[in-house]
């Protein structure tokens, strides 16, 4: 199993928010140990769609930005908290929900703002890449819920050597979010 890559073609996004809603549906009230405790119902968006409107009626352009954990190869959280943040064999960055108890500072240490602090469980939390689904033998799709739920094919998800991932990256149309950070992320954007 290779490192997972997520490609997001935001030019295909129509703002339906299925990705954001499906993430909430998957994680609110559900415990996926050892990877995650339940996400709070409000205030946390491990997968977030932000809408930007430009222009005036009748000429309006809407842009939808998708943000979540970028699952960085050079993850500053792994470097700063090696006792409670680790990388899975899929290349996903995981905050251990037991060992990270009380470590609110992680919220401020992620340069992408992808970490939230659960004040009920007293733990930092973020996107897990739905590692629990990727490892579930009964989950046929073998992709995160955000990817599985998209009606407009915004996403391409697969191993770093998957031909469809390699072909799309080879076009040069995809880039990382804030490449100047130098963190070698596993999420790439087009548009």
What are these model-derived regions, one by one?
Residues 1-191:
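Non-ligating segments of multi-cofactor redox enzymes
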């Amino acid at each position: 199993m290779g490192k997972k890559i997520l490609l997001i073609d935001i030019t295909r996004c129509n703002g339906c928010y299925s990705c954001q809603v499906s993430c909430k549906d998957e994680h609110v009230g559900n415990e996926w140990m050892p990877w995650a405790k339940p996400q709070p119902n409000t205030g946390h968006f491990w997968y977030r769609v932000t809408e930007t409107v430009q222009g005036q009626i009748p000429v309006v352009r809407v842009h939808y930005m998708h943000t979540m954990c970028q699952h960085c190869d050079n993850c500053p959280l792994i470097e700063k908290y090696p006792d409670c943040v680790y990388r899975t064999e899929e290349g996903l960055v995981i905050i251990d929900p037991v060992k990270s108890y009380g470590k609110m500072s992680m919220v401020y240490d992620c340069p992408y703002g992808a970490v939230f602090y659960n004040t009920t469980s007293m733990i930092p939390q973020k996107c897990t890449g739905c590692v629990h689904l990727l490892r579930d033998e009964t989950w046929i799709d073998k992709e995160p819920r955000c990817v599985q739920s998209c009606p407009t094919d915004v996403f391409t998800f697969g191993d770093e050597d998957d031909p469809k991932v390699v072909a799309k990256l080879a076009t040069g149309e995809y880039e990382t979010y804030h490449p100047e950070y130098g963190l070698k992320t596993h999420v790439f954007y087009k548009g």
